[in-house]
From Swiss-Prot:
InterPro entries: Aldolase_II/adducin_N, Aldolase_II/adducin_N_sf, Enolase-ppase_E1, HAD-like_sf, HAD-SF_hydro_IA, HAD_sf, MethylthioRu-1-P_deHdtase_MtnB, MtnB_viridiplantae. Keywords: Amino-acid biosynthesis, Hydrolase, Lyase, Magnesium, Metal-binding, Methionine biosynthesis, Multifunctional enzyme, Zinc. Substrate 2 binds at S417, S418, K451. This is Probable bifunctional methylthioribulose-1-phosphate dehydratase/enolase-phosphatase E1.
Length: 518
């Protein structure tokens, strides 16, 4: 009997031994899940038998990936849950122990419908526990910006409770569409997990949320923070306050300027079909000289990659970076990408692994590849450079004034770059003009999609929640990006800056040499 399918490895037998299955670790995990179900019922997260919880049965003698899994059942009153109601699964999802049937009116026991989704978090993120909540705030949070594919928030204290985030960081939670049956969400959940490597949760529109963590404590803590933040966003929305921007000003209350960014009709009211609500900016060759990226940023990352990997090798962040690089290099080797070399397994000598990683990263940088694994590692290396003041972000002189003007006019400004979101924040947060992030509402990188593909711009328009893609102005220096954005319905301007590549003749786009021309 399998709860969610999957083949079994040769090592599974050891974890399924009678001693482990009937031992203290599994017993404690059963009791813990029952206790958490009762607790979350009081929170309003698992009422009406909905929602579910799963944890790994912690045995220090076994790697987390090989530990048994305890899951709550489906259709059982969570406030009456006891340890004997739990299912126990192997590490690959096979049911090893089921609860006994109870007399009427209890339903026959059934493993949670969330099982295949839980397994995605276990297998793709190495989770130690996963929580599925139907808390009211998780549903309403997906309705605040109809059609948005992400929930975004920044400058709220409780964001610090989410792994990898600080007060000034932007929290981004992917939103997937609901389906009639829980198991039908499995593929879209997996796609969201893959597309958002820093995320520890996925929202399901009009449904609830899946939250995972390294342990049950981490998962519970993050779930509490997420629910708090969603509740805060709902209350801020009711007050007309924008929760997505650093200053939390009024929502869409500022008067729009009469310019390319805003058209007006005779009575002075903005035309909702044509007025520009958002500006999306490229970085290289648009806000920042290409030479700064090619002559300063890239060399710094290249020259410090070995030092960074050596000093942070055992950190969770670097382990995740290495994991992404392994996946990319395996694909590169299959595709015959020049410069790719095999990376030894995790249990190999540290220096051998680092040597292979450095060789691959240097090759990727030389080829200027726009891939998430490289950009994420570069962002972490650059963070050290900015923190030590070895690096300072560079922008063209006209950029700060334009950002201030748009911000004062109530225009939302976003960045879309091949560099990681962290790298973008570092660049704009450490300039000679001070911290320019206060004028920016969000950041998009290659996790959204390739910048030369129309689909990526469609995703951005969905995330920004505009009525029409035509309400977004995109400024870039790359012709192919301009074509893709225009195909998605954006208004597009091409930036002409020193060092930019020449444009094709009769390209058909408006061009500017300074943001002051907009």
């Amino acid at each position: 009997m399998a709860c969610c399918g999957g083949g079994r490895g040769e090592g599974a037998a050891a974890t399924e031994s009678e001693a482990y299955l009937e031992g203290e670790a599994v017993r404690e995990a059963r009791e813990l899940v029952a206790e958490l179900c009762r607790h979350f019922y009081g929170q309003g997260w698992v009422t009406g038998t909905v929602g579910s919880i799963t944890v790994k049965a912690n045995d220090p003698a076994l790697p987390l990936a090989d530990q048994l899994i305890v899951m709550s059942p489906s259709g059982v009153q969570k406030e009456r849950m006891v340890a004997e109601d739990m299912y126990v699964l192997s590490a690959d999802g096979k049911v090893l122990s089921s609860p006994v049937s109870k007399p009427w009116p209890n339903k026959p026991p059934k493993c949670t419908d969330c099982a295949p989704l839980f397994m995605k978090a276990y297998l793709m993120r190495g989770a130690g526990a996963v929580i599925h909540s139907h808390g009211m705030e998780t549903c309403i949070a997906t309705m605040l910006d109809h059609g948005a594919k992400e929930f975004r928030m920044t400058h709220m204290e409780m964001i610090k409770g989410i792994k990898g985030h600080g007060y000034r960081d932007e929290l981004v939670v992917p939103i997937i569409e609901n389906t009639p049956y829980e198991y039908e969400l499995t593929d879209s959940l997996a796609e969201a997990i893959a597309a958002y490597p820093k995320a520890t949760a996925v929202l399901v529109r009009n449904h609830g949320i899946y939250v995972w963590g390294d342990s049950w404590i981490n998962a519970k803590t993050q779930a509490e923070c997420y629910h708090y933040l969603f509740d805060a966003a709902i209350k801020l929305y009711q007050l007309g306050i924008d929760w997505t921007t650093p200053e939390h000003g009024p929502i869409n209350s500022a008067k729009r300027p009469r310019s390319v960014l805003s058209s007006s009709i005779p009575n002075g009211c903005p035309d909702s079909k044509s007025s520009k609500h958002c500006v999306v900016l490229d970085i290289e060759g648009t806000t920042t000289p290409i030479s700064f990226v090619t002559d300063v940023m890239f060399p710094y990352a290249r020259d410090n990659v070995r030092k960074h990997l050596t000093s942070t090798y055992s950190s969770d962040e670097t382990k995740e970076d290495i994991k992404l690089l392994r996946i990319q290099v395996e694909e590169d080797l299959k595709n015959g990408i020049v410069g790719s070399v095999p990376i030894p397994p995790d249990d190999a000598d540290k220096e051998e692994v680092i040597n292979a990683l450095v060789a691959n990263v240097e090759s990727m940088i030389k080829a200027d590849r726009k891939i998430t694994s490289l950009k994420q590692l570069q962002g972490h290396i650059w963070r050290t450079g900015f923190e030590s003041k070895e690096l300072q972000g560079v922008v063209f002189d006209d950029v700060p004034e334009a950002l201030k003007h748009w911000h004062a006019s109530g225009m939302k400004v976003y960045i879309y770059s091949s560099g990681s979101r962290e790298a973008q924040r570092l660049l704009f947060g450490n300039t000679a003009y001070g911290d320019l992030r206060q004028y920016l509402c969000g950041f998009f990188d290659t996790t959204t999609g390739n910048k030369r593909e129309t689909r990526s711009y469609f995703e951005i328009s969905q995330s920004l929640g505009v009525d029409s893609p035509a309400q977004i102005l995109f400024i870039t220096d790359v012709f192919q990006e301009a074509v893709a954005a225009k195909s998605a319905g954006f208004e597009v301007i091409i930036s002409i800056r020193p060092g930019n590549a020449p444009l094709p003749e009769n390209h058909g786009f408006r061009t500017i040499k300074s943001f002051s021309e907009i």
